[in-house]
């Protein structure tokens, strides 16, 4: 079949279709479909199907779905902020100009110039916002190993000259100390040079062993910082350092608080014999409460007479 015959058959079919609808449209009108020859309802459906919401400005404005606000127009390339625009303010670090530039201090010049993050001289040096506990505690790594990986930037104390505590505030060292006189860490390592043993008022004790008030402590601070076996020095009552210490001058009042301190937590469940306290103190070696011997920390006591059970007393009376 020739192409001309196919064209003539199609043309005849188009005339039949136009006669059925009552119109006299040509074949060009059948193939060239435009918006004028299509009903408005069909046009809206075709437009909604062929329109994409992700395309650019070529597709025109599309109404939003029912119940949604209209979309804001996308800014053009001239309205978008550029990341390299001069109006962008650079964020400064909290440590900006808080340390001296090492290169400038050694050679007197710096390759970064005014853009350097470190201070070029004392005039540009700023005061850093430190933590309230900055340089108020000992560095454990420097104390145990003799060195610290952080060096001068460590927030803990390495040397006595680094103590930056305010003069109006008491210096608090949170260094746990055992009753044998050595820190609770490694007992073989000596303290750093320049530090004598921490005093009792500046040490934090464990909750199970509450220290007596400062006015009632009869022992010197060196009693807890001495090695085991060293005789304990007794504080002279005449050399009192505060009014609360001058009120206790007799030996009975001096050694009175030790009577309550020498008892272990299980003393109330035992008898009143001093030997019972000594035996209970030796059995509770792992407890935190200190148990002192009467011959070392107090005046010698007379041995108590042997006690007998009440039933034996009744038997001896009846006989």
Swiss-Prot record:
Region of interest (Interaction with CNOT1), ranges: 305-319
P-P-P-P-G repeats (start-end): 63-67, 190-194, 211-215
UniProt region (Necessary for nuclear export), positions on chain: 1-15
Region described as Necessary for nuclear localization: 87-160
PTM annotation: Phosphorylated. Phosphorylation at serine and/or threonine residues occurs in a p38 MAPK- and MAPKAPK2-dependent manner. Phosphorylated by MAPKAPK2 at Ser-52 and Ser-178; phosphorylation increases its stability and cytoplasmic localization, promotes binding to 14-3-3 adapter proteins and inhibits the recruitment of cytoplasmic CCR4-NOT and PAN2-PAN3 deadenylase complexes to the mRNA decay machinery, thereby inhibiting ZFP36-induced ARE-containing mRNA deadenylation and decay processes. Phosphorylation by MAPKAPK2 does not impair ARE-containing RNA-binding.
Subcellular localization(s) per the UniProt record: Nucleus; Cytoplasm; Cytoplasmic granule; Cytoplasm, P-body
Tissue: Expressed in skeletal muscle satellite cells. Strongly expressed in differentiated adipocytes compared to preadipocytes (at protein level). Expressed in embryonic stem cells (ESCs). Expressed in heart, placenta, kidney, intestine, liver, lung, thymus, fat and spleen.
Induction: Up-regulated during adipocyte differentiation. Up-regulated transiently in response to fibroblast growth factor FGF4 in a MAPK-dependent manner in embryonic stem cells (ESCs). Up-regulated by interferons and/or lipopolysaccharide (LPS) in a STAT1- and p38 MAPK-dependent manner. Down-regulated in muscle satellite cells upon muscle injury (at protein level). Up-regulated by various mitogens. Up-regulated by LPS and TNF-alpha. Up-regulated by interferon IFN-gamma and/or LPS in a STAT1- and p38 MAPK-dependent manner. Up-regulated in keratinocytes during epidermal repair after wound healing.
Region called Necessary for localization of ARE-containing mRNAs to processing bodies (PBs), residue ranges: 1-166, 92-319
Zinc fingers (C3H1-type) by residue: 95-123, 133-161
Region (Disordered): 65-95, 179-309
Compositional bias segments (type: Low complexity): 85-94, 179-188, 196-208, 279-289
A GO-annotated cellular component: nucleus
Subunit structure, as described in the record: Associates with cytoplasmic CCR4-NOT and PAN2-PAN3 deadenylase complexes to trigger ARE-containing mRNA deadenylation and decay processes. Part of a mRNA decay activation complex at least composed of poly(A)-specific exoribonucleases CNOT6, EXOSC2 and XRN1 and mRNA-decapping enzymes DCP1A and DCP2. Associates with the RNA exosome complex.
Name of the featured protein: mRNA decay activator protein ZFP36
Species annotation: Mus musculus
């Amino acid at each position: 079949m020739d192409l001309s015959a196919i064209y003539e058959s199609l043309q005849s079919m188009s005339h039949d279709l136009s006669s059925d609808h009552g119109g006299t449209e040509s074949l060009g009108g059948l193939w060239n479909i435009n918006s004028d020859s299509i009903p408005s309802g069909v046009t809206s459906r075709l437009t909604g199907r062929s329109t994409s919401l992700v395309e650019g400005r070529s597709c025109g404005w599309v109404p939003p779905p029912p119940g949604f606000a209209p979309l804001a127009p996308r800014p053009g390339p001239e309205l978008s902020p550029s990341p390299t625009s001069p109006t962008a303010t650079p964020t400064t670090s909290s440590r900006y100009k808080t340390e001296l530039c090492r290169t400038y201090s050694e050679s007197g010049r710096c390759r970064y110039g005014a853009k350097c993050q470190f201070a070029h001289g004392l005039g540009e040096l700023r005061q850093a916002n430190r933590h309230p506990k900055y340089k108020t505690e000992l560095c454990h790594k420097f104390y145990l190993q003799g060195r610290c990986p952080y060096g001068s930037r460590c927030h803990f104390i390495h040397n006595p000259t680094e103590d930056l505590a305010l003069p109006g505030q008491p210096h608090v060292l949170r260094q746990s100390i055992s009753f044998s006189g050595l820190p609770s860490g490694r007992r073989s390592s000596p303290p750093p040079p320049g530090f004598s043993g921490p005093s009792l008022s500046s040490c934090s004790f464990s909750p199970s062993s509450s220290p007596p008030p400062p006015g009632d402590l009869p022992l010197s601070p060196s009693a807890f910082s001495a090695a085991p076996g060293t005789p304990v020095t007794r504080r002279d009552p005449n050399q009192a350092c505060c009014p609360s210490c001058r009120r206790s001058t007799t030996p009975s009042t001096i050694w009175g608080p030790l009577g309550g301190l020498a008892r272990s937590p299980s003393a109330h469940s035992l008898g009143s014999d001093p030997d019972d306290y000594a035996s209970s103190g030796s059995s509770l070696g792992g407890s935190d409460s200190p148990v002192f011997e009467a011959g070392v920390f107090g005046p010698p006591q007379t041995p108590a007479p042997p006690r007998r059970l009440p039933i034996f007393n009744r038997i001896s009376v009846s006989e």
